Each structure stands twice: as C-alpha cells, then as structure tokens.
A protein has these predicted regions:
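N-terminal secretory signal peptides that target proteins for export/translocation
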Residues: 1-5
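Bacterial N-terminal signal peptides
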Residues: 8-20
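Beta-rich carbohydrate-recognition and catalytic domains
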Residues: 24-118, 124-198, 202-256, 262-308, ...
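Short glycine-rich, acidic/polar surface loops and turns
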Residues: 312-315
Length: 369
C-alpha cells in the first residue's frame, strides 16, 4: 500500500519551482521553420477506404528511421462513436501505409457499453520490462440532451501490452490488461462526467507521471477542459492522482491531450490541443511536474490554412540540432459546411505536418537585427 507521505513527496508543490519554470519558459520558444501546405493523410489517401470521418489525435514516434502513427479513425456513424484505433507507418513522413487495426469500438449509442467509443491511442515503451504499452480511452456513448453532452462520457483509461517483446513489438498485436484510471471514489472535484479523456505517461527520475484530462460535460455549454497529473512507481501502476497540485495551471479554459517530450538538457516540453486559432499549445517544465503557462504555436499560415479547426498535436519528434517533426490533426475546411457541436465542423479529419525548432526566446528577432 502506498503511504500518504509517499504520495505527498511524489506530488509535492515546491514553492520555488513555479518561479524557475516560468524563468525557463521565458528563455525558450518553439518556432515553425517549415510548413507543409497540404494535409498528408486524408480519407482519400491509399489504405483509408472505409474511413468515413477521418483521423483525430493519437501519437507519432520515430523508431529506427520509421515513423509510427497511432491514431483514432472515425470510421462510421454515430460520429465520434464508431471508431477504430489504427497503426500506420511511413519512411519519409509524407507517404503512409496502414499496418493494422489495433482495436475497434462497438458503436453502441445506448449509454450501456463501456467500450462504445475508443480514442487517443498512446504507445509507451517500458524499458525495464521490454514491452510496448498502449494506453487509450474507452467511453460510453448516448445521444446528447439539452443539458448533458453524452456522445463520449465516463471515459476510462485502458492499458494494453504488446504480445511481441522488445522494440520490434511496436505494432502489436496488443492485449488488454486492465483499466488504470477512471472516475470514481478517488476522483477530485474538478473531474466531470466526461471521465478521463486523455492519458500520457512519461518518466521523471525513477517514477512515472502522466497527464490526464477531463471536463464537466454534465452541464452545457461546457466551460472547462482541464488536465492534471497522476504518478505511479511503475508503468503498470497503481496510478495515483496528484491532488495537491491538480488541475495544472497551463490554460485558462481549454487543454486536451498533452504529449510530453524530454529535451536534450533533461527538461520537458509538452504540446497539446489548446483551441488556439490555426495552432496548438505548448508548455515547458524543469522537473516534469510543474509546468509553465501555455503558449500558442501557429502551424497554419497563408496558403497552408487547409483546416477549419486545427485540433490535436501528435507529439514532438526529435530530428537533431533542436529540430522536431510535429504532426497534427485538423478538420478539413469544406465550403458550405456549418459548424455544429461546440463550433466544430463535422468535416473529415486529416493529418498535417510542420517542422519546428527550439530556440532561445527572441533569437529570430535578434538575427534580423
């Protein structure tokens, strides 16, 4: 049994650290130094047949020269409910092949099936046990009411493990081993009817931490999407909420799906869906626990504005010399399609790409001078 003292030590809010985090954040920034003007993966791409509503969220990582995309495919009706979690691969970032379906949701729209909708597949490698883990969200689903948003509610985080040992097992097949986080007696007041809507684990020292998210979807209009931290001694848990410091003070109203990257100096950066127009959000941390106020990274400008809404970044992929590849999903902007739920257009989701550079703040302005 984990003692209260150990929990407090793992999640303690050291007073001087937020000041140090803020100081570090002011010294660094992410800059887009190459924009790809068209989406690189759409419902019209090879291998995407039968994917009615496109792609949303997930993670891309690079392993021995191959890019691996784990994403949510919105394959049918009900929209945002009938889903597949898929694995795609690419050697050049631009041309993709679908490798497999990892899991498929039931599409049940009665509110009874806890796996009616599946979202946000996040592959994480357990170095100690030499196995890939796949964390993803499973929701109950039902028609919305004037008061409640029920399309995706009571999210639970499932953990699956690859049956193939070692890094070569990244493609699975994956076998479910259980739920690691859900709304219940251990929840905090800021957690709402949506349940746990995202989960991303990362290593800090000899412990694991994870961002997890939620929203009070029991009352429309929905005012807040927030994230907080949980920690565990091992990747397989048990996962314990950092209630003393939750929710994270990164964004005022909307933050979803943070994905963390460890930088060369041992500090941390996370990218996330922020609702920023034509962009995504990012935040820095010195210790992986205390995070700076978020900033916007604009990923679509000029002729490259193909999305009506830029949605979810899929993680920063180090390419060397402080350059990162950043894939993201967004809804393609089709003329004549009005926004519906939460001002989002039900147009096909696609994947875009930018190259990003980590710089000292103001470096470009100084170079111009």
């Amino acid at each position: 049994v984990t003692s209260p003292r150990r929990i407090a030590v793992a999640c303690v809010a050291i007073l001087w650290l937020p000041l140090q985090v803020a100081a570090q954040s002011e010294k660094l920034e992410l800059i887009v130094n190459k924009q790809f003007d068209e989406p690189i993966l759409t419902i019209h791409s090879p291998d995407a047949e039968g994917n009615k509503y496109g792609f949303e969220g997930g993670r891309v990582l690079k392993l021995k020269g191959t890019y691996h995309l784990f994403t949510s495919e919105m394959v049918g009706d009900p929209h945002w409910v009938k889903m597949k979690l898929a694995h795609w691969t690419s050697f050049d970032r631009l041309h993709w092949e679908r490798a497999s379906t990892l899991f498929e949701s039931s599409g049940d729209f009665t509110g009874k099936d806890p796996r009616a909708a599946l979202w946000s597949p996040m592959p994480i490698y357990d170095q100690m046990k030499e196995h890939w883990n796949l964390f993803y969200v499973a929701y109950q689903s039902a028609p919305d009411t004037p008061r409640k948003w029920l399309t995706n509610h009571e999210g639970r985080i499932w953990r699956a493990v690859s049956k193939v040992k070692g890094q070569v097992g990244i493609g699975g097949p994956y076998e479910d081993v259980g739920i690691v986080l859900q709304r219940g007696k251990d929840s905090d007041p800021w957690e709402g009817l949506q349940g746990t809507d995202s989960f991303f684990p990362y290593k800090v020292g000899n412990k694991w931490y994870a961002f997890y998210g939620t929203a009070h979807t029991e009352m429309q209009p929905i005012s807040l999407w927030q994230v907080g931290l949980a920690w565990a001694p091992n990747l397989d848990g048990p996962w314990i909420r950092c209630s003393q410091i939750n929710p994270a003070n990164i964004e005022r109203a909307f933050i979803e799906n943070p994905i963390v990257t460890v930088l060369a100096d041992g500090s941390y950066v996370a990218v996330y869906d922020s609702g920023a127009e034509h962009g995504v959000g990012y935040t820095f941390s010195v210790d992986g626990i205390h995070w700076s106020p978020g900033r916007a990274l604009i990923v679509q400008k000029g002729n490259g504005m193909w999305a009506s809404e830029v949605r979810t970044p899929l993680g920063l992929i180090p390419e060397g010399k402080d350059i990162f590849t950043l894939f993201y999903t967004g809804n393609q902007d089709l003329l004549g399609v009005p926004p519906v739920a939460h001002e989002i257009k039900f147009t096909p989701g696609a994947m875009g790409l930018v190259e990003v550079k980590l710089e000292k703040a103001g470096a470009k302005d100084r170079d111009r001078r």
